[in-house]
């Protein structure tokens, strides 16, 4: 399969801009400097580079106007040559530099992921002069020239062995042009992807995206698999998990959480294409190296395929935009501006030595014994809630798959439906499938937030007299733990045929277990996962109660068994089956 050009052995890669000229490297091209970069990256154990032929340099079109409209698109004031490159609006000079770059990469045995429409980089838009101020993702004229560029570029370089994948471009959803209709991005990315496939059907198309929603929004997980062969995540601590120190559970597990969510919902392999510490106000160099080591091992264990650090070399000394705009970092390379290695380099070398001892340099898939059902994406679910559910499961010695509730419900011994906050969380057909699986022996856990499910009395064995908005903290007493949970609603129980497992401080029942056919339904009237998703220190502080006792109850009921466990809440395990016997 052509995906195996990238997805196979676990890889460690890096996002590359030249050490001397960074984003300006194609204009101020210095092959000797690039070779010096390659030498130190090779010695550091890097095998994969993500590279960026800057759109504004490789297709440097200028619109030359007559009295009222564009008369022609030229190269500066000059006419485009009547050649394949010229007709595509592509700079022959830039392509020759790219050719030399690829030849050098081949010499050092680097594998290249090429970002094709690199119009967004480090929070700056790079567009050919002709298209400045245009809607880059939806203007028909712009897309026409993008297609010409892609077709010419891919056709010209498709025979270069070092290239193993075509990236749509760096975080292309951040380019202007989405407008009010999120489907504009689907049309744009599908159009670009189809053009790539026409010219080269031997390499995977990679999304290059940083962040995705579930179903709503322009670059959502549900449609990514229709456009691309491989999906990506860019999980930066300062944007998603900034409340916790880098080397703690939440920032580290955010990588496999995001990969699992992306892969399970999109249906295509998903890897960590960008991540980093983002500079030394966020951490020290030693902390950065410790973070990198933890992320490597965690990503390997959870089947994340590979990781690529942002970025190769420090850039904080550069004085042109966007670097002069950037006050959050830019000094986040593997190497400093003088090509001196940081402690992170030694961690990469040590990891690659360990990896070489594993047959095939990849672990067997880790076993999964539960499913997290994602409520319908109508604005009622957050990544914080899903991440908290994922982490509670890890603490309970469970590994989960993610499934979107409106889809066909797959078999699983345990279903986790966390913090329901939407009145349309699951369609009736899917819900009936789910309950049938419970009647046949599965375990279902539902925790309530503001959403309503009409069948709750029938499937939980409880009668709810009323609910009241209280916006207060309720403390659950369960398994020797006192577990405070912030809740918007209180549910007053009128009667119960279910087993009451826990009450709050007012002696109001809040946690129930009800036999349903051969299976069981657990119901919690409090939004445990939503609370922990935003609770400071929830997966960090030693004095935080052990909320995972709830999920351990679910694991025990569902018969989840592992060959090993650990009492420490932040030291977790994965289980990998080599064969039927081991």
Regions found by a protein language model. Give the residues of each.
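Active-site clefts of carbohydrate-active enzymes
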Residues: 18, 170-182, 235-245, 255-294, ...
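Alpha-helical scaffolding within the catalytic cores
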Residues: 33-37, 148-154, 211-224, 250-261, ...
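Aromatic-rich peripheral "rim/lid" segments of glycoside hydrolase catalytic domains that contact
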Residues: 310-369
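A conserved amphipathic helix/loop scaffold
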Residues: 423-582
């Amino acid at each position: 399969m052509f995906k195996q050009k990238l997805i196979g052995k676990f890889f460690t890669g890096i996002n590359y801009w030249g050490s001397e000229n960074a984003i300006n490297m194609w204009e101020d091209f210095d092959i000797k400097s690039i070779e010096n970069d390659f030498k130190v990256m090779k010695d550091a154990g890097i095998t994969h580079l993500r590279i960026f032929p800057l759109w504004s340099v490789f297709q440097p079109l200028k619109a030359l106007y007559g009295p009222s409209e564009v008369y022609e698109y030229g190269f500066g004031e000059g006419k485009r040559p009547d050649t394949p490159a010229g007709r595509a609006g592509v700079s022959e000079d830039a392509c020759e530099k790219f050719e030399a770059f690829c030849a050098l990469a081949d010499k050092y045995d680097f594998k290249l992921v090429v970002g094709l429409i690199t119009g967004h980089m480090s929070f700056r838009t790079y567009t050919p002069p002709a298209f400045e101020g245009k809607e880059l993702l939806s203007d028909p004229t712009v897309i026409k020239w993008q297609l010409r560029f892609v077709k010419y570029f891919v056709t010209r370089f498709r025979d270069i062995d070092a290239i193993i994948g075509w990236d749509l471009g760096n975080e292309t959803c951040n380019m202007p042009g989405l407008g009010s209709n999120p489907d504009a991005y689907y049309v744009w990315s599908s159009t670009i992807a189809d053009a790539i496939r026409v010219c080269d059907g031997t390499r995977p198309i990679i999304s290059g995206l940083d962040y995705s929603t579930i179903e709503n929004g322009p670059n959502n997980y549900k449609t990514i698999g229709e456009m691309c062969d491989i999906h990506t995540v860019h999980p930066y601590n300062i944007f998603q998990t900034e409340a916790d120190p880098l080397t703690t559970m939440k920032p580290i597990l955010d990588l496999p959480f995001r990969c699992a969510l992306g892969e399970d919902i999109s249906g295509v392999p998903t890897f960590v294409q960008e991540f980093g510490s983002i500079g030394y106000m966020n951490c020290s160099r030693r902390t950065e190296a410790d973070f990198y080591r933890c992320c490597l091992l965690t990503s390997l264990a959870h089947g994340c395929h590979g990781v690529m650090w942002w970025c190769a070399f420090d850039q904080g000394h550069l004085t042109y935009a966007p670097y002069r705009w950037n006050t959050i970092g830019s000094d986040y390379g593997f190497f400093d501006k003088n090509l001196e290695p940081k402690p992170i380099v030694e961690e990469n070398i040590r990891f690659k030595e360990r990896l070489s001892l594993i047959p095939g340099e990849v672990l067997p898939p880790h076993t999964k014994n539960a499913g997290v059902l994602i409520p319908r994406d109508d604005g009622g679910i957050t990544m914080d809630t899903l991440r908290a559910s994922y982490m509670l499961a890890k603490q309970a010695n469970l590994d989960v798959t993610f499934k979107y509730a409106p889809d066909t419900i797959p078999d699983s011994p345990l279903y986790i439906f966390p913090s329901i906050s939407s009145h349309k969380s699951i369609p009736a057909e899917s819900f009936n499938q789910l309950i049938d699986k419970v009647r046949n022996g599965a375990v279902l856990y539902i925790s309530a937030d503001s959403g309503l499910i009409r069948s709750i009395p029938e499937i939980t064995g409880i009668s709810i007299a009323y609910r009241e908005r209280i916006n207060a903290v309720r403390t659950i007493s369960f398994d020797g733990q006192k577990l405070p949970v912030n809740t918007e609603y209180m549910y007053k129980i009128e009667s119960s045929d279910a087993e009451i497992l826990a009450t709050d401080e007012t002696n109001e029942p809040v946690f129930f277990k009800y036999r349903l056919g051969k299976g069981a339904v657990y119901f919690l009237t409090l939004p445990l996962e939503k609370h922990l998703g935003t609770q400071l220190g929830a997966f960090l502080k030693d004095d935080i109660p052990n909320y995972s006792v709830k999920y351990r109850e679910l694991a025990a009921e569902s018969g989840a068994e592992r060959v090993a466990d650990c009492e420490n809440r932040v030291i977790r395990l994965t289980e990998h089956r080599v064969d039927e016997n081991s």
